[in-house]
Amino acid sequence: MFYFKTVRKMERIILHCDLNNFFASAALTKNVTLKGLPLAVCGDTKKRHGIVLAKNEAAKAYGIQTAETVWSAKAKCPELITILPDFELYESLSAAARVIYSQYSEKVECFGIDECWVDLSDPAMNFKRAVQVANDIRRRMKRELRLTVSCGVSFSKYFAKLGSDLKKPDATTCISRENYKSLVWPLPCEALLMVGRKTKQALNGLGIFTVGDLANAPKEALSTRLGVNGVKLKNAANGADGESVTDYKNRPLPKSVSSSATAERDLTTPAEVYAALIGFAEKVAVQLRQYGLLAGSVGVTVVSPAFEGAELTAPLPELTNNSAILAKHAFALFKNGYSQSTPVRAIGLRAANLSPESLVQRQLSLFGEPVETERLQKIEDSMLKIREKYGEQAIMRAACLNSAAKAFSPGFFKG
């Protein structure tokens, strides 16, 4: 006699964690006396970055919005406390949060500095236990990092993300196959990830105003109006996106790597521009090495004091992740494509046409260029080793010691 055992298909269970008011909350971890007071993280008005980057719940109560000017925010709330951003603190807390997430799953996918998806899918896992995991994470965040986090639990990445948005701060929302139609479908279509202003307008033009409308809309109409993304959104509205959580270590490789900044005063000489490009090139080169990539082209973006912009791009003679080579060709682009008599307000460098270093066979030349490339690479390797051992400021390029160093925030030329 034969016996057949029914094997239950493993349900996908995905957690989305969103650190509440992250920039503003991070500041409270260093100064608890600010708790409960209206607080906004803002750019420095003296350095031409005077907008609100983030705010806490107390500031939100005054109607203060992200990206509005500090002057406007102060008009709404004269007692508003403004502080400068502390990106080293944000990166440190974000990394600490990922450590906590990784103790519950090997699959943790970052979505910006303050959000992560965590794949809890396992034959022994169910939604009740997943909610317990989410609540445990919330408790640990408060105890270990002094941060609050909102969690969404669902069978879909889109719904998990939406769940973390439904209740804030410090809450857990479960969107299951049994309740998603009552919880999600009445919401406006823009509540769904990937529905921005233009997509919302396109959907509204089709008579689609809620997630439920989108879920039940004809696939043909969506495909005609929005192409493949229209069908993708319909699937997402039905919880059928099927997108997996990408392990952070196995994240997709970027198509380009860039670094840019607005100077605290206009750059007026070629030497200052070159120093800035060296600073950007070193940051970009470090990222390229971390990804194991080589760049096939370099680009420069320049903005004048009159906010007139220029974007310049050119292929590189050979694939590289060397900062000196990137800066050299970026500077040549700048000299050939931008008026030398026009000051520079903002500038950036971008490396594109990227290829995995492990798959690339560098072609050799008989005319001496590989010797120079090898020399520059040895210099860069030595600089990185010195910085790793003695700190970022232990060694700098001479070009970065001129007056351009005063045109950017402290620490800009640290590689």
What are these regions (language model features)?
Residues M1-N235, V245-Y248, V286, P370-G415:
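Gly/Gly-Pro- and Ser/Thr-rich, intrinsically disordered tail segments characteristic of DNA damage-repair
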